[in-house]
Amino acid sequence: MARYTQRPENALKRANEFIEVGKPLRALDTLQEVFRNKRWNYAYSETVIEPLMFKYLYLCVELKKSHIAKEGLFQYRNMFQLVNVNSLENVIRGYLKMAEEHTEAAQAQSSAAVAVLELDDLDNIATPESILMSAVCGEDAQDRSDRTILLPWVKFLWESYCQCLELLRVNTHCEALYHDIARMAFQFCLKYNRKSEFRRLCDKLRKHLEDICKSSNQTTGVSINKVETQQLCLDTRLYLLDSAIQMELWQEAYKAIEDIHGLMALSKKTPVPKTMANYYQKLAMVFSKAGNQLFHAAALLKLFQLTRELKKNLTKDDLQRMAAHVLLATLSIPLPSAHPEFDRFIEADKSPLEKAQKLAVLLGLPQPPTRVSLIREVVRLNVPQLVSEDFRNLYNWLEIDFNPLNLCKRIQSIVDIIEGGPAESNLLTPYIQSLKDVTIMRLIRQISQVYESIEFKRLLELASFCNIFELEKLLVESVRHNDMQIRIDHQKNSIYFGTDLTESQREYRPDGPSLQSMPSEQIRSQLVNMSTVLTRAVSIVYPNRERDQRAKLRTQMVHHYHEIKDREHQRILQRQKIIEDRKEYIEKQNNAREEEEARRQEEESRKAKLAEQKRLEQEQEERERKRHQNEIQAIREKSLKEKVQQISQTAHGKKMLSKLDEEGIKKLDAEQIAKRENEELQREAKELQSKLKSQEKKVDYFERAKRLEEIPLFEKYLAEKQVKDKEFWEATEKTRIENAIAERKDAVSQQERLKRMYPDRDEYLDALKKERASLYVEKLKKFEIALEVERKKRLADRIVRRREERRQAFLREKEEERLRKEEEIRLAQAAEERAAAEARRLEREAEDEKRRAQYEKQRAKEEEAERKIKEDRERLAREVAVERERSEKERDTWRPRGGDRPSAPAGGAGEWRRAAPPAGERNDRGAERSERGGDRNERGGDRIERGGDRIERGGERAERGGDRDRKDDGGADSSWRVRREPDSQRAAGAKDAGGAPASRDDKWRRGGDRERDRDFRNDGPRRDRDDRDDRDRGGFRRNDGPRRNDEPQRETGGNWRDAPRQSDRDNRRPGGERRDRDGRDVRGDQRGPASKEAGGGGGGGNWRTAPAPRDEKPAAKRDQPQDKENKGGDDGEWTSVKRR
């Protein structure tokens, strides 16, 4: 039985009843069942579902069930995101508003609870509990109250924002609502100072943007190519950037700047100046916090250019203030190092150059800026002339004037002006320290050009900004980056500059005020100076040389110009034409691209409309199906009520039904109600067991409570024991220390007492050494003798060992020489084998190439033969048509006369062909043969068409055709269509054909059994392929025999590959007779005697009309002595054909 579900309006009414009796969880479950059941999803409009949804979300907020709210919101979105977007927007905004109100109420409640706690007892503000809590957790009362009361609601509100963002991220209809919720989430993070949630929110939005860029344009999807979408994303990222700066999350601010730059690059329209100004301002702030003074100054310079160019109502004071800001930021950039590539020796993810290039892209610069380029740009924009006199002097003192003795004093005056200026000057305060560092570096460089050495004291007097440690650090940094040659002498408290005259590791290009070069730089540039002086001397000695050379060069240039001016003029004109053509081509390409884009968009919109229409149709079908199911369900519910009424009439049924509510009754049937009675008995038994368990739990809880009460007593005992242990340890330690002091005093007194025995000890040792000196000398002599003996022994052993080593080395070299020779012999043999193999391969390739050429030649000849056959067939068809017309005329002329057919003359073919039979018989046979002739013409065409692929099917054709050629004894000029037949068969064929008697031409047709042709036709099974090909092309045929008619001889022999020739197959008399050849077809000797019904000339027995088994042996013929030998040759030819 299907599960019973309530209608939406009934569910809402029942949920209100549960709320009134204080059961919000039951009310939430009731409403949740409606959304879980897809039965009502599409059956009701938003006017019915929207109040239910508000009540559902209200309960979720009250009970802090964010996951249940998410389920309902997603279901509601699927129902109304394409039907009524306003309803979805109202529901989501109402849900977030309720969550925010409850969070604010919790915050007020937390503050009120702290205030009540603080004002609880004015006489005893610091209670013992508050003191202990502050010592344990380090939190005040407000933090503890917030963690208890406010933090759960903050977490719920955060989850609500995340759920709504996930809900709306792919819906183009709710795109504005999505970005509004994102801004609300930023405000939430700012209000409650949630930095970790802010980072996760930034990552979530960045992931959503990546998904939008990757995903295709679906029906309800968001397309990043839309201008509105790009603007909304840009505004949201700008708001994110402001929030990150307020929360001082500089890493997230930098990521937001990257996203903003990507969106501006993706947009086809230029952003408004206000947006760009805000972008540069925030970018400069981020660079400043990151400590990157160079890009900070570059961002301020871009902001200054943009404001100066686009802001019309800019006052002089604002312009002066901005110019001072830009100038001071640029001058505060640290002096660049001479070797910035030092950082590439440090392992990092990215090199400094790549990072600088990436930052330059954010500023829209083609390459990373430098301090020199920024100062040059500042001067080009006339910034020093826009600032006040003091800052203009600052620029001159740092970048133009050379006055190291007064430099720091002058800069100090500017620093005092900045520090003592008005409140708006506070923007310049962060640059003071950087300005001092730059001033000290300028001072050191200028001092190095004036003094060779200077005392620390004097240098500190000139550098009033820093102490000795800071100054020494700057000097070491200068040497580290190879900017200067400095040596510090701490013994003399002096500093030496540029003392190494042989060292100059870089080319010195001063980027500030300079008086002279360093000594090392002067040594490095001696050759350059000498070249300059020599050039000047040559110009003095030969004053006119340069003028003459210029005149000569000018003459050559004029002459060359007159030679090429016409050609250059034409080239320029041609270039203009090329440019115009290129412009036209580009314009055409653009137009075509735009048309293609328009077509593509139209196609996409059409597909979207079709998809939308299809979806609506499917939804309509789904609604109809669900409505039908609802009707069926209503019928089932009605029958269930009737059954329940029948059961309720009995006393037992009333007792059972009283324990069930309406919803439970609707879910059961009669059998299940009977089953519930047994379940009730089991339930009572379980209740008894549960009571016993509850008593057991009470005893357990009582025992646990006693032990909890004992814990403070145990802790008190342990604390007292710890105090006693500590006192005992201190007493023991004091006693140990006193004993150690006493022992040391005793040891010292013993040492002082024994010192008077030192002289006696020394006298005793001297006497002992004198007594044992002689013994030492004697032992030394024995050692030297033993040493000499051992040395000689070892020398002898070394001589023997070295001889053995030389012998082994000789044998080893001899063995290596033998192995080397064997290896050389092996390599030579291998090289010869490779050369022989290569030669064989080349020979095979040459042979294959030769065979391929022969095959192509044969193919060309066959194609030529087919063309001629086609021409002959067409010519013969025309002759047949003319002959038929003539026969018709003769028939019309001879038919009245009748009479017998005259006998055929004994002459040639021309004579007996004119001896025609009577008109009636001849015409009847002529008509029949004309029909058969047409069929043969058609079959002949089929043979020609099939003849084209005989080369490819050469295996099968060669086997059959080769046998036919070799079984013929027709001599060198006999075709496969001309075969010998038994005398009886020939006679029958001649009789049926009514032709001339056999003459000597018959032997020519049969191709007699000539011994002289046997060598050409049958030369054994080992015949070469080239000989066979030549034979097939007619190279071994003899054309000296008589022919049937006076037509010229064929160009090629009777090769089986040749297509059937019209002249061979269809040469017949005017009455339709075929030649005598048809009686002796290719397979005539295998088919037996020709049928008499085939017509005159034996033409009805075509080789295609009857089966001819290859294995059937022909009748014994005395004229066929070469059959066995030809078969052997044919097998060899079949193998050759397969190799091709």
From Swiss-Prot:
A Pfam match: PCI
Q: Name one GO cellular component term.
A: eukaryotic translation initiation factor 3 complex
GO BP terms, alphabetized: formation of cytoplasmic translation initiation complex; regulation of translational initiation; translation reinitiation
Which Gene3D superfamilies does the annotation name? 1.25.40.860, UVR domain (4.10.860.10)
Which InterPro entries would you find in this protein's record? EIF3A, eIF3a_PCI_TPR-like, PCI_dom
Which of UniProt's keywords are assigned here?
Cytoplasm, Initiation factor, Protein biosynthesis, RNA-binding
> Can you provide one Gene Ontology molecular function annotated for this UniProt record?
translation initiation factor activity
Where do Low complexity bias regions lie?
987-998
Q: Where is the composition biased (Basic and acidic residues)?
A: 589-624, 830-900, 921-984, 999-1050, 1058-1086, 1109-1130
Q: Where in the cell is it found?
A: Cytoplasm
According to the entry, every stretch annotated as the PCI domain falls at 319-502
| Disordered, as annotated region | 589-632, 830-1140
Q: Which family does it belong to?
A: Belongs to the eIF-3 subunit A family.
Q: How does it assemble?
A: Component of the eukaryotic translation initiation factor 3 (eIF-3) complex. The eIF-3 complex interacts with pix.
Cross-referenced PANTHER family, in alphabetical order? EUKARYOTIC TRANSLATION INITIATION FACTOR 3 SUBUNIT A, EUKARYOTIC TRANSLATION INITIATION FACTOR 3, THETA SUBUNIT
Q: What is this protein for, i.e. what is its function?
A: RNA-binding component of the eukaryotic translation initiation factor 3 (eIF-3) complex, which is involved in protein synthesis of a specialized repertoire of mRNAs and, together with other initiation factors, stimulates binding of mRNA and methionyl-tRNAi to the 40S ribosome. The eIF-3 complex specifically targets and initiates translation of a subset of mRNAs involved in cell proliferation.
Name the chain's protein: Eukaryotic translation initiation factor 3 subunit A
Q: What is the lineage of its organism?
A: Eukaryota, Metazoa, Ecdysozoa, Arthropoda, Hexapoda
